[in-house]
């Protein structure tokens, strides 16, 4: 089970100097602040400051009462002026920066734009640099060549299905599939990047996180969350999608020869029956599946088993054959396998014994179709497009520009190679020094806070401080396996990944095989603790509990998160809270089960654990009362238990970032050393108020109702509005900054706090 926690975001750059002078802004004086006021009366009027101020003012609605609805106050202008792209379920600063970074990658790989970089003569290995750029451009060209993709028809997918199911017999003795045949089929799926109802993956061993071991998890659902299988409308759409895709792939008439889109009427009863049986099987899988809350619990999901023990629990699968089938030649599993849910295996054994072989075959066929169908030409993938669009609230008639899809393929398949050029053209090295300074100040704030927490006993306090000291920062881009700054290292790293300029389907299949082989080849080897999990252009930040690392790719070090030229109160409200969020993950309901090196064991005393649980329950209750509107105007409650870790991280991150910034401000009351100057048009706001406004802007977001429902069912994060309002409700510093009366919406008497 993957235990990496993610967090993302980004911002747009506006012009128009005249817009800085907005409509009259209410004067909000800070009350009760113990820190010094900003004595530096200088207003920065550089182009960067003017742009930053304009962006903040554009997003705000100063007529709104910040004490009643802070998200409306900080983001009301954003809600009014911004629109969701026709092909997206939401619009926010994640999307803004994602698009901005993708534009940069497109200029690298799209020859038609005439902006591609020329490998520098100063590159130590110009031949490698040239080969790398060629590889990127070949992959992109294969993806953009839709006529060649269409002319290949459905044959590539049919060949893949035939290969995977070559050993599968539907004429099993006694109505049960041979366990070795099933194991080999599951191994084939895994080797090509697909996970069926069980999946094996390699990662740090929970009890010895310096070494990689095998983990066994559940999966195999085609809908985003279990709840969708109880929604009749969605189930009907899903059955229709499966039936249409079977018709597309196996029908007698090739859909590319038709002049119309395939409809329900075109689908034979045979395919409809298959679809209903496949959905029925998945519905059973969903019913025995582990709840998201328990899957995220590192104690409940840490169940070491020998191969013999697993074989006894689920004898319908030949486990030695499955395991040997996914491991490279010469690699053997020598450690216990970590099972995420023994109860799921028990339920799966019952389900497999009650499922006829033909249904199982059709289910596996559907797995291959749903995973690889998007790599076919447009007519063949249309039913899949309609399903995914509908679940996000996007019109199925909307078509995403092909280049956007192809850039996403570059980022996925050759991300670090593209990242080499990204950091050369779009990443100022000065960002690293400044952001590391911010992170260190927040770590220092935590170190100062821990001893003041009366519920944290001496033994647990000692372990917490040790873990904080051992926390590792990974910044910008990987320098190991591969070194993103080195053309030679990148060429070597991707040397075994073939790329064709003319065969997009083969490229996708080869990448799946290559990435799986790279992962399984690490079994029993030391964990690479220097590699970032994603390429540098990624707009994310991470905390990895099994390595005790906080990770900040270059892609997130942009406005509204961070800008070297922005005042500290803006950077701490943006990037500082992000950094504090990731640090807090080390001590949330999941992270606190891992020690300083990432080992799972109980280093908390029972007394401290009980106190933590009581404090955590406050967050569960608070966020569980928040709602979002569904597509028909119905209320859907946020799952306070499912989002607990992220909510603790949001609240702790805001508090510690604010305290770290205040400490710096107190050490530099002139505001000169740490750039706490004023911004044009925002002079009426105090630095503390602008800190909180900067925080909220990170979460300004417009969403379609269907998208929101999807997220609260499948995501561990709260909806964006509640990541703003829910957090400031718990902040005395916010209430003081905006003079919110006790009992007002944003300053309730009862507040939740862990860290």
How should each PLM-predicted stretch be described?
Residues 23, 38, 47, 312-316, ...:
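Intrinsically disordered, low-complexity linker/terminal regions across diverse proteins
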Residues 35-58:
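Short, Gly/Pro- and small/polar-rich lid/capping loops
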Residues 59-81, 227-247, 456, 644, ...:
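Hydrophobic/aromatic-rich, well-ordered segments within soluble, folded domains that form packed cores
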Residues 106-441, 478, 499:
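Noncatalytic, helix-rich "gating/capping" subdomain that lines the substrate-entry/channel surface
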């Amino acid at each position: 089970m993957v235990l990496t926690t993610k967090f993302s975001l980004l911002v747009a750059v506006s012009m128009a100097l005249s817009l800085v002078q907005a409509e009259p802004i209410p004067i909000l004086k800070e009350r009760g602040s113990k820190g010094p006021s900003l004595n530096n009366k200088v207003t920065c009027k550089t182009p960067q400051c003017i742009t930053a101020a304009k962006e903040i003012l554009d997003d705000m609605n100063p007529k709104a009462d910040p004490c009643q609805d802070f998200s409306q106050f900080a983001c009301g202008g954003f809600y009014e002026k911004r629109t969701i792209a026709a092909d997206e379920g939401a619009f926010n600063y994640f999307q803004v920066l994602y698009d901005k970074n993708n534009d940069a990658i497109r200029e690298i790989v799209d020859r038609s734009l005439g902006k591609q970089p020329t490998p520098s003569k100063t590159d130590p290995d110009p031949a490698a640099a040239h080969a790398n750029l060629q590889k990127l451009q070949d992959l992109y060209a294969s993806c953009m060549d839709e006529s060649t993709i269409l002319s290949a028809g459905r044959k590539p997918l049919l060949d893949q299905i035939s290969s995977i199911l070559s050993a599968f017999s539907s004429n099993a003795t006694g109505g049960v599939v041979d366990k070795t045949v099933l194991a080999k089929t599951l191994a084939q799926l895994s080797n090509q990047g697909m996970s069926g109802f069980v999946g094996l993956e390699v990662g740090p061993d929970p009890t010895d996180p310096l070494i990689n071991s095998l983990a066994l998890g559940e999966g195999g659902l085609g809908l985003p969350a279990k709840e969708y299988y109880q929604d009749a409308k969605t189930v009907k759409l899903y059955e229709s999608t499966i039936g249409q895709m079977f018709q597309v792939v196996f029908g007698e008439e090739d859909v590319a020869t038709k002049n119309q889109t395939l409809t329900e009427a075109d689908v034979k009863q045979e395919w409809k029956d298959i679809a209903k049986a496949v959905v029925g099987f998945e519905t059973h899988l969903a019913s025995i599946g582990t709840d998201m809350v328990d899957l995220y619990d590192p104690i409940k999901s840490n169940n070491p088993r020998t191969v013999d023990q697993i074989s006894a629990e689920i004898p319908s699968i030949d486990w030695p054959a499955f395991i040997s089938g996914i491991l490279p030649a010469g690699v053997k599993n020598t450690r216990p396998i970590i099972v995420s849910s023994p109860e799921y295996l028990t339920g799966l054994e019952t389900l497999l014994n009650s499922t006829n072989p033909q249904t199982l075959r059709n289910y596996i066929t559907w797995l291959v179709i749903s995973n690889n169908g998007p790599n076919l030409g447009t007519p063949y993938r249309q039913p899949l497009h309609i399903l995914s669009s509908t679940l996000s609230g996007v019109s199925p008639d909307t078509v995403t520009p092909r280049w956007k899809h192809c850039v996403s393929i570059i980022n996925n398949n050759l991300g670090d190679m593209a990242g080499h050029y990204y950091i050369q053209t779009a990443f100022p090295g000065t960002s690293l020094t400044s952001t590391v300074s911010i992170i260190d100040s927040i770590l220092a704030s935590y170190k100062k806070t821990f001893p003041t927490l009366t519920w944290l006993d001496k033994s647990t306090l000692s372990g917490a401080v040790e873990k904080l000291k051992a926390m590792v920062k990974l910044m910008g881009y990987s320098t190991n396996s591969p070194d993103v700054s080195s053309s030679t290292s990148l060429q070597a790293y991707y040397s075994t990944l073939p790329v064709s300029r003319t065969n997009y389907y083969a490229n996708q299949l080869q990448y799946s095989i290559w990435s799986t082989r790279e992962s399984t080849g690490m079994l029993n080897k030391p964990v690479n603790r220097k590699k970032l999990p994603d390429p540098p252009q990624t707009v994310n930040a991470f905390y990895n509990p099994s390595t005790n690392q906080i990770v900040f790719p270059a892609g997130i070090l942009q406005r509204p998160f961070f800008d070297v030229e922005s005042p500290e109160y803006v950077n701490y409200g943006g990037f500082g809270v992000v950094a504090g969020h990731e640090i807090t993950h080390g001590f949330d309901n999941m992270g606190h089960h891992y020690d300083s090196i990432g080992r799972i064991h109980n280093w908390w005393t029972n007394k401290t654990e009980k106190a933590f649980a009581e404090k955590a329950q406050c967050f569960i209750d608070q966020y569980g009362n928040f709602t979002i509107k569904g597509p028909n105007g119905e209320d859907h409650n946020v799952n306070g238990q499912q989002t607990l870790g992220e909510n603790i991280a949001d609240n702790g991150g805001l508090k510690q970032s604010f305290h770290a910034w205040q400490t710096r401000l107190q050490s530099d009351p002139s505001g000169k050393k740490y750039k706490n100057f004023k911004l044009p048009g925002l002079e009426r706001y105090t630095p503390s108020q602008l800190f909180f406004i900067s925080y909220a802007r990170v979460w300004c977001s417009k969403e379609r109702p269907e998208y929101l429902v999807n997220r609260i069912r499948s995501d561990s994060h709260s909806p964006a509005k509640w990541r703003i309002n829910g957090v400031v409700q718990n902040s005395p510093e916010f209430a003081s900054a905006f003079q919110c009366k006790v009992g007002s919406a944003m300053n309730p008497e009862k507040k939740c706090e862990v860290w």
